[in-house]
Amino acid sequence: MSTARTENPVIMGLSSQNGQLRGPVKASAGPGGGGTQPQPQLNQLKNTSTINNGTPQQAQSMAATIKPGDDWKKTLKLPPKDLRIKTSDVTSTKGNEFEDYCLKRELLMGIFEMGWEKPSPIQEESIPIALSGRDILARAKNGTGKSGAYLIPLLERLDLKKDNIQAMVIVPTRELALQVSQICIQVSKHMGGAKVMATTGGTNLRDDIMRLDDTVHVVIATPGRILDLIKKGVAKVDHVQMIVLDEADKLLSQDFVQIMEDIILTLPKNRQILLYSATFPLSVQKFMNSHLQKPYEINLMEELTLKGVTQYYAYVTERQKVHCLNTLFSRLQINQSIIFCNSSQRVELLAKKISQLGYSCFYIHAKMRQEHRNRVFHDFRNGLCRNLVCTDLFTRGIDIQAVNVVINFDFPKLAETYLHRIGRSGRFGHLGLAINLITYDDRFNLKSIEEQLGTEIKPIPSNIDKSLYVAEYHSEPAEDEKP
């Protein structure tokens, strides 16, 4: 079975068994960094890309068309309004507006055209502090607008008259680098001359070297690749004023911590560091004490799990798992689902089984070629398939708002892994389901994770209320439909 789509992909809908429709999946735009993100086009799928958002002359021309006193918002191309009800994870705000932060109008235009209407709680806390130049240590849930929280001040502080790298965003996975770069490109599209480059392992190093020979203002990278470019003298970072560590707990784990230490040592001493993470292990605290100067600490996590995600478990034997999954597919109204396995081999075997059952399915794991991973990520994000089977490669920051069901086919060993997995549904305050298939060997781990996260994972009922996870059952009426 091939998971990549070539030409004219034919998608097998899940028929009337579970009420799902054939054809591409659509997700509404959402405000505040958690909205439906612009999809990467095929010519942008190379994991290393430099994007020039117009020229200064084009920006001036655009600005000239908006005369002082005009209602410039009327010129915006806004996405459809997201009418889905949201949880307090994103609605419990102070009532601030993006205009309150005195941002450039060109940046505001990009923000509103993303469908971001008002700042989310993490954005209200982060944006003004980041604009002041102070270091930040922020703890916030997955899917609450963290990308917007750091990209907005990062773009506001760029000096486009200079032709050097001024900001870096470091992320742990190639897919997350692609996603963040696409958001950055879209938000900055009205800022004439802003150049954003994504660079990750698994792509041609020569391409990176050629792109860095031209002007680049923002680099979004995985740790190993950017350190390699710095050591080669290709990526000149002596003018970097801001570095962001997204998913900092992963970046400062044993896999990456020495690389991150080496990167920080190459930066100017007066650089600003922004750390964002859902969990703060000892490694993050140690890094903070060594490198952050009187950081402003943000903690928006009274509880760890997203309020919109309802969690269930089903006791099964290993042999019953595929049958149980088939039952879930037939009974649930799935918009898109992500199914997690604990190894690459099990991912491929399960994807084959799902395909044999007659359901559309892609798979993705770290052992696949990068261009193949890019294609799968792009196609699933664009709604060309309902179900994605994957390893924990897909747990970090990936924001696909159409996903309303996450299934742990294999239960994870760590509470942190569980937290990031179920955070793929219920993005930006919306509702979703997390269903765990639990074997006899998993029972103690289930209890341990419940206790560590302070959450409740309930036995799965025979019928699951659609209002817990289906958008049509929990949407607000449109303005013109309200009484």
Curated annotation (Swiss-Prot):
PROSITE patterns: DEAD_ATP_HELICASE, HELICASE_ATP_BIND_1, HELICASE_CTER, Q_MOTIF
Cystine pairs: none
Occurrences of domain Helicase C-terminal (ranges): 308-468
Domain annotation Helicase ATP-binding: ranges: 127-298
Major localization class: cytoplasm
Motif annotated as DEAD box, chain positions: 246-249
Modified residues (Phosphothreonine): 36
InterPro entries: DEAD/DEAH_box_helicase_dom (IPR011545), Helicase_ATP-bd (IPR014001), Helicase_C-like (IPR001650), P-loop_NTPase (IPR027417), RNA-helicase_DEAD-box_CS (IPR000629), RNA_helicase_DEAD_Q_motif (IPR014014)
Motif (Q motif): 96-124
Protein's UniProt keywords contain Cell wall biogenesis/degradation: no
Region feature (Gyf binding): 286-316
Catalytic activity: ATP + H2O = ADP + phosphate + H(+)
Assigned GO CC terms: adherens junction; chromatoid body; concave side of sperm head; cytoplasm; cytoplasmic ribonucleoprotein granule; cytoplasmic stress granule; cytosol; heterochromatin
Span list, region RecA-like domain 2: 307-483
Subcellular compartments: Cytoplasm, P-body; Cytoplasm; Nucleus; Cytoplasm, Cytoplasmic ribonucleoprotein granule
Pfam families cross-referenced by the UniProt entry: DEAD, Helicase_C
Subunit text: Interacts with LSM14A, LSM14B, EIF4ENIF1/4E-T, PATL1, EDC3 and EDC4. Forms a complex with DCP1A, DCP2, EDC3 and EDC4/HEDLS. Interacts with LIMD1, WTIP and AJUBA. Interacts with APOBEC3G in an RNA-dependent manner. Interacts with RC3H1. Interacts with ATXN2L. Interacts with MCRIP1. Interacts with MCRIP2. Interacts with NUFIP2. Interacts with TRIM71 (via NHL repeats) in an RNA-dependent manner. Interacts with GIGYF1 and GIGYF2.
Function: Essential for the formation of P-bodies, cytosolic membrane-less ribonucleoprotein granules involved in RNA metabolism through the coordinated storage of mRNAs encoding regulatory functions. Plays a role in P-bodies to coordinate the storage of translationally inactive mRNAs in the cytoplasm and prevent their degradation. In the process of mRNA degradation, plays a role in mRNA decapping. Blocks autophagy in nutrient-rich conditions by repressing the expression of ATG-related genes through degradation of their transcripts.
Protein name: Probable ATP-dependent RNA helicase DDX6
Species whose genome carries this gene: Mus musculus (Mouse)
